[in-house]
Amino acid sequence: MAESEVTHIRYLIVLMLFIASTFSYGDRVVLSIAAGDLSRDLHLDPLRLGYLFSGFGWAYAAAQLPAGGLLDRFGSKRIYGISIVCWSVCALLAGVTGFMAAIPAFYALFLVRLVSGFVQSPVFPGNGRIVAAWFPTSERGRASAIFNSSQYFSLVLFAPIMGWIVHAFGWKECFWFAGAIGIALAAVWFKVVHGVEAHPWISRAEINLIQQGGGLASLDAGSRPRSNTLTWSAIAWLLTQRMFVGIYLGQYCITTLTWFFLTWFPIYLTQTRHVSIVKVGFLAALPALCGFAGGILGGVVSDRLLQAGHPLSVARKIPIVLGMLLAMTMVACNYANSSTTVMLLMSLAFFGKGFGALGWTVISDTSPRDLIGVNGGLFNLIGNLAGVTTPIVLGLIVKRTGSFDYALIFVAATALLAIVAYLPVVGEIKRIERPALPGVSS
């Protein structure tokens, strides 16, 4: 291959991010699809099921900062690949808990979900870091939208499959299936993914295109361990930046929507709309497909606005605000009588959530070059506190009220709060660099 020929390896890389993220979210989908049968076997009420859903979120959120630091120190390929192997093993172990008595099985499954959340923590900080390295600024919105849309595609792909497996075999087999395909994915990951300048299939012309367009192509070329003091001082500095605080708050709100759809939405269909478990798998895929389309379209629209000459702030904020307004329409489900109307409203809300989910694009646009992994970890930590609070709060609301009406109001209110976070709080979206610290060499 001539070095002057522009290869397109960056598109292969974002495809790998999309596949890996789809499998990661697929691991989370398993529990929500299997929740009905699992709850009966383990005798779980809605609140205890909410705690089980949140087990992943506790560890996932807590591990974000260590994960970001590991990515910055040792590079994305290695840490991400190890993550895939470990979460696949956790999925296999989750299936084994089905052979235990109900009470020990609950605690064992909760522990396995904690560990799974911990080992999956590098996925999205790694995605943001890899996109920042591999893509010029003008393509970053689409690239981030592609991997971010995996959360919807995972429902489209895995909800019907897992629904059928639960119906035909049982909930244990769902976890074993997820673990087996994860191990296969890890083998492909280590073969295909490399740093920009180290990739054996890339041409010099593509490297130049990435670098000249604002991509951080040498990001993993010199990863070095750094002191904990420097890392913690960097975190403290990030938390003093109003723009980042607004972005973190917005991500928490948007992630609340994600966790509703990943955890309680299938149960809403079975308990409130009286849909069978087999049909739930297919019906849950319909709004997810709309979310997938919205996720891709949101990134495309944002990049088109940027290419048309609009400021970065305008190009990123317009899809976010419009998307959150659409997501708020789920409240109308409280007044809908037919399941068809509910599915249309949820599809519109899911489309809006996908259209507005540009948080990772904004983080790639704004993070200091030497703190992309750490800032991505902090961003994902705060965002995924919603993975802890949302399942429990919704479970508590459903248990206390006996319906999902106030649960949907709560979720829609967080979409409104996301708009507040991005409009008055964030301000101008731009990359900022950390001031040099005394006695620290660059």
Regions found by a protein language model. Give the residues of each.
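A late C-terminal transmembrane helix in Major Facilitator Superfamily
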Residues: 295, 364-401
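Helix-loop-helix hairpin linking two adjacent transmembrane segments in secondary transporters
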Residues: 147-200
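Hydrophobic core of transmembrane alpha-helices in multi-pass small-molecule transporters
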Residues: 90, 104-122, 340-356
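C-terminal ends and interior cores of transmembrane alpha-helices
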Residues: 85-102, 324-337
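Cytoplasmic helix-loop-helix junction between adjacent transmembrane helices
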Residues: 112-152
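C-terminal transmembrane helical hairpin of 12-TM major facilitator-type secondary transporters
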Residues: 313-359
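Central cavity-lining transmembrane alpha-helices of secondary-active solute carriers
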Residues: 54-69, 285-298
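Extracytoplasmic gate region of multi-pass secondary transporters
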Residues: 31-35, 237-296, 356, 360, ...
